Amino acid sequence: MKNNIKELLNTAVQANDLFMKRYKESATTIGLMDQALRNLGNNSEAVTIDSASLNKKLVFIILDSQPDIVGVGIGINGGEDLSLLGQYELNQLTTAKVVNLLEENLL
């Protein structure tokens, strides 16, 4: 696991903890896709935050070719198709920003 995905994972975990404290009815889980994406031929790693009750997931993707950029998308649990929500510099994707994305998309 590369340092940038570790940093992203840490930010996502902190944001998810805050989100679940604020919205006790929400049950979200964190996932890491590192080898799974590479096994599919994608030169990338991703962190997911899944909501089973809404059947939705936020996906934060870092491409090997752009290690300081995080693509953020939303999709359905178990699906591969994503709608792009935006791109962020890794160092600007704060815990507060991830909480905001969770509030906008998983409530």
What kind of feature is each model-predicted range?
Residues N43-I49, K56-I74:
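Short, conserved beta-strand/beta-arch hydrophobic-aromatic motifs that form part
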Residues I30, P67-V70, T95-V98:
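Non-transmembrane, interaction-prone segments in cytosolic or luminal domains
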Residues E89-L107:
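Well-ordered alpha/beta subsegment
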Residues M1-L54, G79-Y88, Q92:
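Negatively charged, low-complexity tracts enriched in Asp/Glu with abundant Ser/Thr
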Residues K57, D68, G78-L82, V98:
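Residues in flexible loops and secondary-structure boundaries
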